[in-house]
Amino acid sequence: MTITKRKNTFYTSQFISYMKGYYLHPDIRGNLVAFTSDDDVWLMTLEDMKPIRVTSGQGVAIRPKISPDGKKIAYTIIWLRKGKGGGDIFITGNGETKRITFFGSMNTRVLGWLSDDEILVLTDFHTPFPQWSETYKININDGTMEKIPFGPISNIAISGDIIVIARGYQDLPFWKGYKGGTKGEFLISYDKGNT
């Protein structure tokens, strides 16, 4: 069997003709795809593959997540002003942008949506060290926060009753043979984290 490398395997030629650049942090919900490029959030449908810029000039946008109803996008904006950096969560939908957090922490990002009104956020806000991040559930309507007792995590995936937590997975890719205590691991719960 011969394996040949093809340029741009994951994109249709139609998509490439519209945009050339660096594409990061994709998220998909139904037929919608959100991603970042040129420090902004972009959105497109799988039918027409024509990206539309959703944000502009707010700072560096990262990790967009589309709401379950497909009407909102949560994302992190990172900025650097007068030698100090920060990051917070914003929601864009129905032509409006709303700032959800006021943490000012570079290590703040959206993990995903729990419902159309609640997001999961990972942040080092209220922790003694920037490497120590905790998970919060935030209501996007009234801003109420609830700390979720998952302990230290790097990422999370939720589907129905199943929760997969990733810990320590940012290790450098060339550490493949590393067998020490900080290698990444997945923890899986089949009952919404009750066990």
From Swiss-Prot:
Any single GO BP term: proteolysis
Keyword Cytoplasm recorded: yes
Statement: the UniProt record of this protein carries the keyword Hydrolase: yes
UniProt-listed Enzyme Commission number(s): 3.4.21.-
Subcellular location: Cytoplasm
Molecular-function GO terms, alphabetical: serine-type peptidase activity
Alphabetically ordered keywords of this record: Cytoplasm, Hydrolase, Protease, Serine protease
A GO-annotated cellular component: cytoplasm
Stated role: Degrades oligopeptides in a sequential manner.
Protein family according to the UniProt entry: Belongs to the peptidase S41B family.
PANTHER family cross-referenced by the UniProt entry: TRICORN PROTEASE HOMOLOG 2-RELATED (PTHR43253:SF1)
Protein name per its UniProtKB record: Putative Tricorn-like protease N-terminal subunit
Organism of derivation: Sulfurisphaera tokodaii (strain DSM 16993 / JCM 10545 / NBRC 100140 / 7)
Taxonomic lineage of the native organism: Archaea, Thermoproteota, Thermoprotei, Sulfolobales, Sulfolobaceae
Gene from which the chain derives: triN
